[in-house]
Amino acid sequence: NWQEIISKGFRERLDKFQSFSLFMDICVRCGACADKCHFFLVSGDPKNMPVLRAELLRSVYRNDFTLAGKLLKKFAGARPLTMDVVKEWFLYFFQCTECRRCSVFCPYGIDTAEITMMARELLNLVGININWIMDPAANCTRTGNHLGIEPHTFKKVIETLVEDVEDIPGIALNPSFNRKGAEILFITPSGDVFADPGVYTMMGYLMLFEHIGLDYTLSTYASEGGNFGLFNSNELMKKLNAKMYHEAERLGVKWILGGECGHMWRVINQYMDTMNGPADFLEEPVSPITGTKFENAKSTKMVHIMEFTADLIKNNKLKLDPSRNDHLNVTFHDSCNPARAMGILEEPRYVIQNVCNNFYEMPEEPIRENTFCCGAGSGLNTEEIMDIRMRGALPRASALKYVEEKHDVNTLACVCAIDRATLLALTQYWAPDVEVAGVTEMVANALVMDGEKEVRDHDLRDEPYLGVED
């Protein structure tokens, strides 16, 4: 009865989500989005145009839920739900990374990512999904993070990173875990804790917080900021996101600080307050170091690490030596969700320009809100579709290759854990001499800490600072 299951699920979601119902009806097929999708640009497949990808779903909608479709059938652009249609859904809705670049150019503001979310949710009802989405989601349900790491192991890994990083400045770092009464709960994607190169970003957080004396704690239960429910099911997204609020309430913190992640921030900025809020038990975030009130986080009670760090720099609370990053020629990749779903555009650039002397922008067309996707977001970072991923990443790779050749760029910075995982494959294929790094990693490189050892000659990756190797 798979057809019945999908049809019933379709009806329920049309009734529940007003935006989905609206998006099914208002598209005029103008084609403004057609050449904005990286997968269409590189494949030339018309069904990878956002408008025609959505038509795969709309055609069934017309057939089952509109009078014109029921009467006129194919003359109204309607078609029945068959197994071939389901196969098309699987093929094309898993070639959408939910990056929302097409939505920027849509004159009606249609969010094609939400159409993809609904299509995947319908497929999931009949057991059609991919392991790279389901496995992390199941792990997060079971242990609180995508990798399925138990609380005691999470704590041990952080302590190991502390041991590794303490030798660089020569200063003891003192993170706390599950500490009740801390002012701030810090939550970051598990990729920053367990995956290279994300671990260097985690080291950067630890050094930064120690330097400013931040009263924060980590949770071994809400040990994941990312949310694979966004790629799979609204109910699962709500469930996974709830753990952050529940843990913040249990620990009695004032507000939440979030690390460098992508889809984590779309969920927080666009869905969190209505899904799991209001978080009346938390306070409107105020920096304990500068006194700045983060008014944009008034409802969610959660602040992005780039906003927090940019505010520290603006108020002269960090002593920085940008020359410590002179061995890096840096460009910046605007991660889709922080950029388009949250508007974090200038803060990372402001931070980078204050901690690096050599920063070069990619061409204007594929950056900021027009940024091209890494090619493997929304759970598509899986080996068996590597050929599709590399094609999808070509527009971003082309811009990267341009600045690499023009400015000898050797570092691609980003503020997304999935980017730090997916861009490794991209750079290895398209730009082998370029490393991928988090912005907070470079902040820690430049950070002049109180009481640090007299000669600090290596960065977080144990690479010598420029001139030291001589």
Regions found by a protein language model. Name each.
Residues 27-33, 37, 96-102, 106, ...:
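Short cysteine clusters
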Residues 35-63, 104-123, 379-393, 421-432:
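Iron-sulfur (Fe-S) cluster-binding segments and ferredoxin-like electron-carrier domains
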Residues 15-21, 54, 58-291, 461-470:
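Iron-sulfur-cluster electron-transfer modules
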Residues 301-352:
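C-terminal amphipathic alpha-helical segment
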Residues 1-29, 38-75:
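N-terminal cysteine/histidine-rich coordination modules
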